Amino acid sequence: MEDKILTKEEVLQNGVCFEEELDWGGEFYEQIVCENELGEEVPYTGLAYDLYSDGQLEFYGYIDNGYRHGLAVYFYSNGKIKRINNQDRGSAEGIQKEYFENGDIKSVSYCIAGGKILYKKYDETGKVIEEKTEPTEDDFKIAKKWGVDLSTLDINLK
């Protein structure tokens, strides 16, 4: 299932600007925080975004209790999608996609806890230039540690 990419209008209507209303904080400055009505730093939950200086959308993503969690989308300054990441508490999780500025796919990977388990990288003509299509024994161990059974997954890197 393909993630729904929000329009700029949806992002601006439902999110908050990271640069204006959020900051890094919490333990080890690893959380995204905001101030509550008492002026106290609290972990942020919701949709956050950043804009380029010309007002174009640079990034949007979902934050849960201060951590990037769920879909995060990055854009080139021309408005085309640069990268689509799914995250779990700030780590890459599931399918990750990166695009060339012309919109063609640059790479696609499957990640668990931030580690690339499988991937394909393409050149600008669409030719595969590097790939890892089978998990290693270590990948199976890492996946099991995180509760993922790689032997039952049907992962399509397209």
Residue map of PLM features:
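Glycine/tyrosine- and acidic-biased, solvent-exposed loop/turn segments at the edges of beta-strands
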Residues: M1-K158
